């Protein structure tokens, strides 16, 4: 097949008018926060606060590694059995202890990112989390993941919604802009 054999539409045929059609906009934004790394939590919280500021009902569902930034910074060891305790020792929770997914450089990478953000007046993930609470963003920890990883409600920061499961998250996602980060 060559370019010459492709049938061309008649020149007089009008193009469909799409300018008159208004795009449908979702009134809800649901973000599944699966990663607990700094460079993933940052855009998660930027998008959540922006969505709420635009008037969208915004929900962030924190699951698996995404739960660890919700752990209080002063909590060092969580879990009931040795596997859960090892997990918490190797993946310290809290928004002050997050690593970068790339170029972590033994902790120097996050420090450089935070420094650059400060120079350019970019709110930190901690500040964005506080803004999200003030804007009414639903910050929902995954109950199943909490149970699996040995996290209790008192291990998590204040101001979160009640822990819930995937059924609730998927129900919230109906008709919403949905992101998985």
Predicted feature locations:
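Short internal beta-strands
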Residues: 58-64, 140-143
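Short, glycine-rich nucleotide/cofactor-binding loops
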Residues: 31-41, 70, 115-120
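A charged, amphipathic interaction segment
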Residues: 106-167, 171
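Histidine-anchored nucleotide/phosphate-binding helix
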Residues: 42-55, 60
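Short hydrophobic/aromatic patches at helix-to-coil boundaries
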Residues: 178-181
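N-terminal glycine-/serine-/threonine-rich phosphate-binding loop
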Residues: 2-40, 46-49
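Glycine-rich loop at the start of a catalytic domain that most often binds anionic cofactors/ligands
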Residues: 70-80
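A glycine-rich helix N-cap at a beta->alpha junction
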Residues: 78-117, 121
């Amino acid at each position: 097949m060559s370019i010459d054999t492709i049938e061309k539409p008649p020149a007089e045929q009008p193009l469909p008018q799409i300018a008159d059609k208004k795009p449908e906009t979702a009134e809800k934004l649901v973000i599944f926060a699966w990663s607990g790394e700094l460079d993933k939590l940052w855009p998660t919280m930027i998008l959540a606060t922006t969505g709420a500021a635009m008037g969208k009902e915004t929900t962030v569902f924190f699951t698996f590694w995404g739960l660890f930034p919700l752990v209080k910074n002063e909590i060092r060891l969580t879990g009931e059995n040795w596997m859960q305790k090892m997990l918490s020792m190797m993946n310290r929770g809290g928004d002050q202890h997050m690593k970068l997914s790339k170029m972590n450089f033994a902790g120097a990478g996050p420090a450089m990112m935070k420094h650059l953000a400060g120079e350019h007046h970019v709110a930190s993930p901690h500040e964005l989390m506080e803004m999200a609470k003030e804007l009414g963003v639903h910050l929902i920890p995954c109950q199943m993941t909490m149970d699996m990883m040995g996290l209790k409600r008192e291990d998590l920061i204040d101001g979160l919604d009640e822990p819930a499961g995937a059924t609730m998250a998927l129900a919230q996602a109906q008709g919403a802009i949905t992101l998985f980060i």
